[in-house]
Amino acid sequence: AVIVGAGMIPMGKYPGSSYPGLAVPAVLRALEAAGVSPSEIGSVVCGHAFGGMLTGQRIVKDLGIGGVPVVNVDNACSGGASALHLAARDIEEGRVEVALAIGVDKLTQFGGGTLPLVEEDSEVQRGMVMPALYAMRAQRYLYERGEGPEILAQVSVKARRHGVANPFAQFRKPVTADEALAARPIADPPTVLQCCPTGE
């Protein structure tokens, strides 16, 4: 299996937009880049975390595609990558010649702050939210390697450096390690400039 086209919309906040409203323009760009018509698509896999049931079916309906299997994958932040894996598998196993993988989510629907987790989750029952969990893992990483938080700040520096040249990036302004370390703390060691932004 090979990727013959890709498309996306700029990362950002799109209040009032729907899942199809976010995905359809990106899919159309991917189809154009691939030189593929919607009628050639043999299967669709849609990865998301918070879209609910039938997210992929709603997107496909808005694209005017019918009569193909649509699988929805809820795999948290790995939903899009999982969709790509499953679409490639459809091709490799000879089920279809052309498969469409979609990764889409709408995180601003929660109004900011931490993302909601299910109450049955053992970490949630202990009061853990994702920033706290990642902070614990970061503390352990630094401890085991004898490093300071400066090493983690380099991740923000690298990500922002790549964002400067990417017209689809949510943030396109560079940041220094000192700025990342001096930013408002979220859960020690990560600061606000070291946490994932909320967006679509």
Protein language model annotation of sequence segments:
Residues 40-48:
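Short glycine-rich phosphate-binding loop at a beta-alpha junction
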Residues 16-34:
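Short catalytic helix/loop segments, enriched in acidic residues and glycine
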Residues 36-38, 53-54, 61, 65-200:
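Acyl-thioester C-C bond-transforming condensing/cleaving domain
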Residues 13-17, 56-57:
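Short, glycine/acidic-enriched capping/hinge loops at junctions between secondary-structure elements
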Residues 3, 45, 100-102:
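Structural motif
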Residues 1-15:
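Generic N-terminal amphipathic, Lys/Arg-enriched alpha-helix
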